[in-house]
Amino acid sequence: MTQPFRSELSRYLRTATVGGSILLIAAAIALVWANSPVSDSYFALRDWQIGPQALHLNLTVGTWAQDGLLAVFFFVAGLELKRELVVGELADRKRALLPIIAACGGVVVPAIIAATIGAGTPGMDRGWAIPVATDIAFALGVLALTGSRIPTSARVFLLSLAVVDDLLAIVLIAVLFTSSIALLWLLGAIACLAVYAFAQHRRITTPLLYVPLALLTWYCMHDAGIHATLAGVALGLLTRVRRDPGERESPASRLEHRIQPLSAGVCVPVFALFASGVALSSELLGQLFTNPISQSVIAGLLVGKTVGIFGISWLAIRLGIAKKPRALGFRDMFALSVLGAIGFTVSLLVADLALAGIGDGSEAEIAKVAVLVTSLTASLIGSALLWRRGRAHAARKDDSDVQELPGGVDK
């Protein structure tokens, strides 16, 4: 592969709409494959175990994609979030507070709705956690495809909201479904992060230190029994974003420029390929609106996430606790709140954990189908709303441009 071709390919993959398109194509392929006559080959490949057993890394291909490749995406997300917190949209404390408040609303309200509807149903004593998570990769992918004319502050809000949301989901998974956390491995991960932060402070730049250190951090986090993607977010947030005198670009900008094409072109699509294959059947689809588990998931995601994110955000802004993102209206924020209902992969994971061993296994399957259908519905509704808001923003910009021209008509 020639250098000019590599450069052009990298530039192409950095385009948000391209990354979003590849992600959704991979998800569609997985869904078709998992429900085709050769579906056995999909599940056999996804469940194939590979890796050194001695290091407790004899994981399935699907787990490698979810815990390994997705950690790269979370690292890039951490870099973006750190930049916005230090020098960008979230440098204003009240604007930084809004996605945190919104994420809390987006966890609490769905949990209450799911617990209320599913009360007394076997498995729902922990199954209420299924609709609390937002799938950051898919939500940002849909936004990239359908919200290109929305102000960039929309991506910042959704990114920061989804990161906080996923961190809360990871805490819930640790509390509800992890029998014990290996404290020594957790301390090892914290020590690795401390070394990384110290190296950043001392302006050390060699990848010979950072690559092994990042891998060791991921390994310690994994063996501690905590979702290993957390290592990616933590490393991203510890990376320096301000340039020193004489520096052409900061370490965060340099790393994001190099890793973003890998994340968008390889890591996220492969993750989507192995995470999106849900087997559908007419029997399961027929129970979708009658089974209390699926009712809990659908209402929790579609209603709970939207109302929780938007309602708490609206209240915080009205009370002066937080500030609205720049150039965004409440209608924009409502559309973004609908995208928050794309639970997808994290919700599928929680469904597996919460409903494993309950009944004949159909409970987990109906929950997964509910997650899939609801996430697709949220994607379509959110896309339609974003498209309408994009047209409104474009029309407003055109009107503004006309007014600035000589002889333009004032409003």
Swiss-Prot record:
Where does the chain cross the membrane?
18-38, 59-79, 97-117, 127-147, 167-187, 218-238, 261-281, 297-317, 338-358, 366-386
GO cellular component, alphabetical, reads: plasma membrane
Reaction catalysed by this enzyme: Na(+)(in) + 2 H(+)(out) = Na(+)(out) + 2 H(+)(in)
Q: Does the keyword Transmembrane helix apply?
A: yes
Q: How does it sit in the membrane?
A: Multi-pass membrane protein
Question: For this chain's UniProt record, which GO biological process terms are given?
Answer: regulation of pH
Provide this UniProt record's keywords sorted from A to Z.
Antiport, Cell membrane, Ion transport, Membrane, Sodium, Sodium transport, Transmembrane, Transmembrane helix, Transport
* Gene Ontology MF terms in the entry: sodium:proton antiporter activity
Claim: Cell membrane is one of the keywords in the record? yes
List locations, semicolon-separated.
Cell membrane
Tell me the function of this protein: Na(+)/H(+) antiporter that extrudes sodium in exchange for external protons.
Record-stated family: Belongs to the NhaA Na(+)/H(+) (TC 2.A.33) antiporter family.
What NCBIfam families does the entry give? Answer: NhaA
* Full protein name: Na(+)/H(+) antiporter NhaA 2
Gene name per UniProt: nhaA2
